[in-house]
Amino acid sequence: ENKNAINADFTFTNGKLYFGTTAKTTDWYDNGAPFSYYVVTTSDDDKTKPDEEKIMKKVVESKTGKFYLKKGVVLGKYIVISDTAGTLTMIDTTNDKVTDTKDIGEAFSGNITYDEMTGTIYFVAGTNDLYGIKVSADGKLKDEKKVRLYETGYSATTPEVYNGKVYVSGSKGKAFQDKGYMAVADVSSDKYKVNYTVELSNYSQCEPTIVKTGENSVRVYFTINDEPGGIYAIEDSKDATSATLETVYEPTGD
């Protein structure tokens, strides 16, 4: 597939590397489909040679979405991947067979987070829609829930989950032009809900870092895609309905 480029994060599991392709040009809208997801074994098949050529095996082909900056998430013997068109695919890494697919019908640019405690994957797609999908022990994508984090804009970030809450950022409008937000969503009940959002000066496109600060409190660290390129945080607790944006570090000078 020489017309496309490998521009996805590598995922290593079960002695294999998994990765996908995207357009070889810098044009995001380049319709160079189909795009594919591959696997390569890392075993030393010929110990008499200092190097050897490996064969890329195609596992998934997408005619609508790319795998640009996409990273597979390991769930035991399975790996779940997504393309930018909103199709999720479960792969059994023992035989590299697809066990299930799910089309959510929304553009999906970020990556997936897995909560092992609840067996749920989380991601944001479309107009700031936070999804949670249960994954069964036999590699099937099951019950789906979602909640809209903000009514305008979008998010291409990867959420973080801790203790029944999901933390994720996005844009309220156009990226790098309009205000951004950091959202805290409760995913512990049957119906997801947004506890609150904190307005940011611009789009925050990063996976937040969660640090436990007490029995029922955490600190959420993240960056904002805007000058001066600082590090920021909010403090969240069990029953919080709001938070104050804190500046942790901002560079000065040129």
Question: What annotation goes with each model-predicted range?
Answer:
Residues 23-29, 86-87, 127-129, 172-177, ...:
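Short glycine/acidic-enriched loop and turn motifs that connect beta-strands
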Residues 19-20, 81, 123, 168, ...:
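Residue position within the beta-strands of beta-propeller blades
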Residues 33-38, 87-89, 129-131, 180-183, ...:
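A short loop-to-beta-strand structural motif that recurs across blades of beta-propeller domains
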Residues 41-47, 92-97, 134-139, 186-191, ...:
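Short loop/turn segments that connect beta-strands within beta-propeller blades
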Residues 1, 51-63, 97-103, 142-150, ...:
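A short beta-strand motif characteristic of beta-propeller blades
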Residues 170, 201-213, 219-232:
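Loop/turn-rich, solvent-exposed surfaces of beta-rich toroidal or solenoidal domains
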Residues 14-16, 76-78, 117-119, 163-165, ...:
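Short coil/turn segments that connect the beta-strands within blades of beta-propeller domains
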